[in-house]
Amino acid sequence: RRGFVPLWQERLFGPDVDGRPDPRPDYYRYLPSFYTNRILQLSEGIESSDLGTYNDLALRSMREWITDPSKSQMDYDNMFRMNYNRNKSGASGIYMIEERHTDQRDFNFAANIAHTFRNQSVLRGGLTARINRTEYYDQVKDLLGADYWLDVDKFALRDNGNYNPLLSQNDLDYYLKHGEARRVGEGDKFSYDYYANLRQAQVWAQYYASFGGFTMSLGGEVGYTAMWRDGRLRKGLFANNSLGKSKTLDYLTYKLKGEFSYRFSGAHAIDANVAYMVNPPQFRDAFVSARTRNTTTPGLDSEKVLGVDLSYNLNLPWITARVSGYYTSVADQSKVISYYDDTQSSFTNFAMSGIDKRYYGLEVGVVVPIWGGISFNGALSLGDYRYTSDANFTQTRDNSEEVLRGDKVLWDDLYVESTPQTALNLGLSYRGPRNWFASVDFNYYDRIYLSMNPARRTRAAYATVLRPDEAAQLPGAVKYTALMNL
């Protein structure tokens, strides 16, 4: 099987890095939180008049967002006007719409075989293979009236000025050949262009047997994964580490799994499952900044997963129920988060490794027939999902090889985010003749934790947190806290 899957994302391009206003209404400098954050950052030694100024700016920003539509909408007329004015002098446009592409080519192969023995046990086996090449690139979608777009790294241009124009080139080879930065038009690739290459192969086997009320299934898999980045452009900031192939990351993986079931009678049965897996890291987490260079994530390792669960099944004419307990541990995960860090005035990459998690809990499900095709159904899930270690991290600038900092993310024993750890479902369902079906359900979810910003969980971040006695000394501290909550 082969496939070609193009994906893209349109985005307005024109960041505020060279003194021109950012056109996005939700740009962080236009929001009330920008001014309240400044109050907190400058809390020590700030004059009371400055506190009042920032407070007034925050209130004005909030009022404008609520009452002035021009503050919450894109001003395309102004963007076209500014681009047209640039055309008169032959200069590059300053606003345009980009289209970020993810074009995937995927080839898959699978073969399997099975043999049934005289005792009706079954042995199955097979192999799978995959070749994937995904191209990531940026493309000019709409110039918004401009004649062309200059393909340079504006952040590098801001940081390095004009003393070394080589550093700001997104396509250094073009600059060295023609003596000027590349001019791109609508439909042209720009900014970044690279291939993510993946090769995978697995061999697996599974044995199934049944003896009286006991059944079991034992399985295993051994696999190999290789991945590498292939840059299509030589970036000026990383002239020796952006064009061409990166080193190949190789991983030997395996999986072991056992499923066991014993049926005491038609009404009572227990199931048990155990699995241990070693998985390769994801490509997106294997490189510090795949858009710009071949540098791999420090401390990158295979992910280890151990899972066990035990269930009791009840099946009677007047009730069907299942009670399950489970435990899962995950070790050595990696993750890369890219974001604009206003404390560094730069787009940064926050690469983490050694992320460990633990999940355990209890699940109960029940169905009770009531009358004439109407039945009651309910389900309850109670879990406890936490981080079990302090992950390692390295933070780098997107436009520099310099490591800004490296330490631990202090989230040991904190809750895993984004999934409910308490869930309840209650409902009534009706099954009528001719497959007619209707249901009414009530769902309740609790203990859903927001995703944590790991940059706020470092030793350096904790060192800047005010103690209660320090916060009490701030002029109007309660007032500004209330403002932040608004």
Kindly give the residue locations of the regions a language model identified.
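Signature of Gram-negative outer-membrane beta-barrel scaffolds
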Residues: G93-M96, R100, V122-S265, N392
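Outer-membrane beta-barrel domain signature, strongest for Gram-negative TonB-dependent receptors
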Residues: R1-N132, T320-R322
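Surface-exposed extracellular loop regions of Gram-negative outer-membrane beta-barrel proteins
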Residues: D171-R183, A226-L237, T248, Y262-V308, ...
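Gram-negative outer-membrane beta-barrel transporters
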Residues: N119, Y327-S329, T348-A455
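Transmembrane beta-strands of outer-membrane beta-barrel proteins
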Residues: R1, L123-L127, M216-G220, L256, ...
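Outer-membrane beta-barrel transmembrane strands
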Residues: R1-P6, S92-Y136, E186-T215, L249, ...
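Flexible, surface-exposed loop regions and adjacent strand-edge segments
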Residues: G3-D18, V140-L150, F155, R232-L243, ...
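Transmembrane beta-strands of outer-membrane beta-barrel pores
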Residues: R2, A129-E135, F211-G213, V222-W228, ...
